[in-house]
Amino acid sequence: MALYRAPKLQRSLLNRCLATASTTPAAASTSRTSTFRKTLEEGPTLDDFIAGDVPNNRVVLGNTSAPRLPSYLKTSIPTGASFSKIKKDLRGLNLHTVCEEARCPNIGDCWGGKPGATEAEGRSAATATIMLMGDTCTRGCRFCSVKTSRTPPPLDPHEPENTAEAISRWGLGYIVLTSVDRDDLADGGARHFAETISKIKQKAPHILVEALTGDFAGNLEHVSLVAKSGLDVYAHNIETVEALTPFVRDRRATFRQSLSVLKRAKEEGVKVTKTSIMLGVGETEDQVLDALKELRKVDVDVVTFGQYMRPTKRHMKVDRYVEPAEFDRWKQVAEDLGFLYVASGPLVRSSYKAGEFYIENVLKGKSVNKRVKNLTMESELSEKSASASL
């Protein structure tokens, strides 16, 4: 009898061992996976680890030190006949705008044209910013979300002709051309830029062209090449104050180098030069004022102020959200310093309603009158000062 029970008992023990061996690791694995997933969800973020200020005995959810987004920085969904028409045209003309790709909050204002205008009138008063030379930059500024590479794709030799043809058929009265930095090219893309502008002017002389360029690695001959291509406005952004430039912009960009670009453009006979400053990155009032004075020394005509908005968590944090009243104050300060036109507000960007400014202020002569008025006031103050000293 024992001879028959032994195999049965052995089989029972073997089955029990196999069952235990097959279920225990799976159960343990599931438990470990759940614990790991829970730790990832509730644990510190990458920013917390980089900062190194998270205590070992507690978990911090998110970035508690970051300022909350104010309500005045939230915008409504853009609408309107002019906006819809321009968006539809873009698809058919195969043009790429910074307005859409950067999700600019002012797209409704710039593409919407004037209130109450017809579709054609709205389109002629609208402003759009076209990106040239690809979508990959050779620089890596800490505020910018454009992708970067040391070896971006080669230029499209047909882009100047195709862009000019598309823009001439588009019907806009004002166009802004910009590009990524191309330090991989011998001329930084200056000839490509200049050729595009020249072809636009050949096909549609009535279209006003603003070129928002990089610094061409400080090569002023390349700046001159673009400045003499037939454009109406030369723009180059200093982005921030001099003291913060090394921490905000790519190491190859300097404040003084940017000033030299704007100075050379004016020396080449460009009527209007323009730049832009982000606020909320840690600047002081004295630093902003000094930057404005330096810009006036090189005869910059237009300046815009806007709030820095963090594109992703990989980019530098917002130091603070600047109140609208402070933007209004900087507008007044800049105008008092002699700038022809100042656009200042939390949502303002470099090309904010650029066409409206140019048409209303430059072509109608308002800028000339304002410049004469400022010079007259300066002359009167000088005379009073001289009389007082006597």
UniProtKB/Swiss-Prot annotation:
The keyword Iron applies. [4Fe-4S] cluster 1 binds at residues 99, 104, 110, 351. Its main location: mitochondrion. It catalyses: [[Fe-S] cluster scaffold protein carrying a second [4Fe-4S](2+) cluster] + N(6)-octanoyl-L-lysyl-[protein] + 2 oxidized [2Fe-2S]-[ferredoxin] + 2 S-adenosyl-L-methionine + 4 H(+) = [[Fe-S] cluster scaffold protein] + N(6)-[(R)-dihydrolipoyl]-L-lysyl-[protein] + 4 Fe(3+) + 2 hydrogen sulfide + 2 5'-deoxyadenosine + 2 L-methionine + 2 reduced [2Fe-2S]-[ferredoxin]. Transmembrane segments: none annotated. [4Fe-4S] cluster 2 binds at residues 137, 141, 144. It comes from Coprinopsis cinerea (strain Okayama-7 / 130 / ATCC MYA-4618 / FGSC 9003) (Inky cap fungus). InterPro entries: Aldolase_TIM, Elp3/MiaA/NifB-like_rSAM, LIAS_N, Lipoyl_synth, rSAM. It is found in: Mitochondrion. Its cofactor is [4Fe-4S] cluster. NCBIfam families: lipA, PRK05481.1, PRK12928.1. Pathway: Protein modification; protein lipoylation via endogenous pathway; protein N(6)-(lipoyl)lysine from octanoyl-[acyl-carrier-protein]: step 2/2. GO terms for molecular function: 4 iron, 4 sulfur cluster binding; lipoate synthase activity; metal ion binding. Residues 120-340 form the Radical SAM core domain. Gene3D superfamilies: Aldolase class I. Belongs to the radical SAM superfamily. Lipoyl synthase family. Keywords: 4Fe-4S, Iron, Iron-sulfur, Metal-binding, Mitochondrion, S-adenosyl-L-methionine, Transferase, Transit peptide. Residues 1-18 form a transit peptide. It comes from the Eukaryota. This is Lipoyl synthase, mitochondrial. It holds the Pfam family Radical_SAM. Its EC number is 2.8.1.8.
